[in-house]
Amino acid sequence: MPVTAHSAHVAHAVRLDRAGGPETLALSEVAVAEPGAGEIRIRHHAIGINYIDVYHRSGAYPLPAPFGIGVEAAGVVEAVGEGVSHLRVGDRAAYVSQPPGAYATLRVMPAKCVVKLPDAIGFDEGAAMMLKGFTTQYLLRRTLPQGGLAAGDFVLFHAAAGGVGLIACQWARALGLQLIGTASTDEKCAAAKAHGAAFTINYARDDFAARVREITGGKGVKVVYDGVGRDTWDKSLDCLQPFGLMASYGSASGKVPPFDLGVLGAKGSLFLTRPTVFTHIATRESTQVMADELFAMVTSGQVKIPVEHRYALTDAAQAHADLEARKTVGGSVLVP
């Protein structure tokens, strides 16, 4: 039998009957079962908001209806199923996982996805850092060009004032990398600079490919980390050194259209990858390794998690509207 701290288990959760705009986000009451073997039940104190939530809501990443959204949160473990040894009732915990369903007051989920949250890290930070922090970790530490990256190397990071971008600016600075960050306004460029970007480019005003060549003395960068997609794709390839790596990890502006692979050869024998966080956290061991490194960066003060926007769970629609309108800087969370 699971160890439990509560007997009544009803959650308020965002459930969608169909894909669509922010107006489809509505709260409903759902029954929450006891955790089975290998599962835990967690009561959320904060829920991270990410662009993947928009993809799920809009149908860009289709899910069978009815469905929930949200892939990261932080809270307190309420119940532990059979066979779970790394978590106990009362533990502060955080996670990023599939399937979606974090937009809820509590939920049951696989324990392998959940890690203990250090006392030095608040719930808002924990909820805002898991997907974005794990993404930064696998990009800067695992998604590397031939020979890896060394202090002084140039990399280009699009949307550098976003949730992932502001973490990446800080992490890159700690690694000694020369991160060139792009953003859509001067204010966002200033935010990226303040968080550690060596150089910034307002891509709404300047030709970012030309500026990258200027900054690097014509050499280009070793890696482009691109979560924007369609709008930045072509010029991003022009920013790379020969044998450089194009890491396309998102498509905020839309999917990259089909293209001729011969372009990669013509532009310098380039490498291309489309990584996802869920490949990297497929096992509990890998998840814990990533969490340990992320938490160490945060508790040491080398990376601070900017949580600039807090919304009530009932205001999830407004949170999505603001995110899609690019009105947010840094991380955003929902509070149950």
Where are these regions (language model features)?
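NAD(P)H cofactor-binding loop motif with strongest signal on the N-terminal glycine-rich segment
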Residues: 159-160, 228
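Adenosine-nucleotide cofactor-binding segment
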Residues: 173-232, 283
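NAD(P)H dinucleotide-binding glycine-rich loop of Rossmann-like/cofactor-binding domains
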Residues: 95-159, 171
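C-terminal hydrophobic helical "lid"/dimerization subdomain
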Residues: 2-9, 284-336
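Glycine-rich phosphate-binding loop and adjacent beta-alpha segment
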Residues: 175, 231-302, 336
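Glycine-rich beta-strand-centered segment in the early N-terminal region that forms part
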Residues: 7, 31-48, 58-101
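Hydrophobic/small residue at the entry helix of a nucleotide-binding pocket
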Residues: 164
